[in-house]
C-alpha cells in the first residue's frame, strides 16, 4: 500500500469518527444551558446560598417566581433574611422590586421585621414603591411603626414614606 493511500485512509477515518465527535462535544459544552439546582431559588436566597442563586440565574430560572403558600419571591427572602449581595444579584438579573406575595407584601415590606435598612435603600434606589400597600392597606412605614422599628420608620419617612391612616 502506498503512502498516499495510507494517508487517505487515515484522513477518511478521522473525518468519519474523531472530528465529528470532537465538534459535537465542543458544541454541546459551549451551548448547553446548565440545569437548575435542586434547591429552589427562593430557598437559596433565604439561606444565603449565593452560588446556588448564581446557578439558577445561569440556568434561566424565573427570578420573580413565588414559592410556597405565601408566594414570596427570592428577592422577598433575601430582603427578609438580610442577604444584601443576593438581593443585589437578583435585582441586576431583573427581579421585580415591587413583586407582591399572596397578601400583597413587597420586598420592601420584608425589610421591616429585622430592620434591613441597607436592603431597603437598595430596593428604593432601584424603583421600589416606598408607599406600597398590603391587601389591608398597610405601608412599610405602618409596619415599622407597628413593630417599634423607629430607625426604619424614620428612614421610610426620609424617603417619602407615608402612613395609610
Where are the model-predicted features located?
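Start-of-repeat signature of ankyrin repeats
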Residues: 37, 70-71, 104, 137
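Ankyrin repeat boundary/linker residues
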Residues: 67-68, 101, 134
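Conserved ankyrin/ankyrin-like repeat signature
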Residues: 52, 85-86, 118-119, 151-152
Amino acid at each position: 500500500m502506498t503512502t498516499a493511500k495510507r494517508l487517505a485512509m487515515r484522513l477518511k477515518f478521522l473525518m468519519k469518527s474523531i472530528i465529528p465527535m470532537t465538534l459535537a462535544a465542543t458544541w454541546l459544552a459551549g451551548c448547553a444551558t446548565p440545569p437548575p439546582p435542586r434547591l429552589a431559588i427562593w430557598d437559596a436566597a433565604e439561606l444565603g446560598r449565593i452560588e446556588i442563586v448564581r446557578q439558577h440565574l445561569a440556568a434561566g430560572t424565573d427570578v420573580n417566581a413565588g414559592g410556597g403558600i405565601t408566594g414570596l419571591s427570592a428577592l422577598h427572602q433575601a430582603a427578609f433574611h438580610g442577604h444584601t449581595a443576593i438581593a443585589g444579584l437578583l435585582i441586576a438579573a431583573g427581579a421585580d422590586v415591587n413583586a407582591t406575595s399572596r397578601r400583597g407584601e413587597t420586598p420592601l415590606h420584608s425589610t421591616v421585621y429585622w430592620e434591613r435598612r441597607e436592603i431597603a435603600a437598595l430596593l428604593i434606589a432601584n424603583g421600589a414603591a416606598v408607599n406600597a400597600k398590603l391587601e389591608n392597606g398597610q405601608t412599610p412605614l405602618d409596619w415599622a411603626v407597628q413593630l417599634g422599628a423607629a430607625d426604619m420608620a424614620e428612614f421610610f419617612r426620609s424617603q417619602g414614606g407615608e402612613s395609610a391612616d
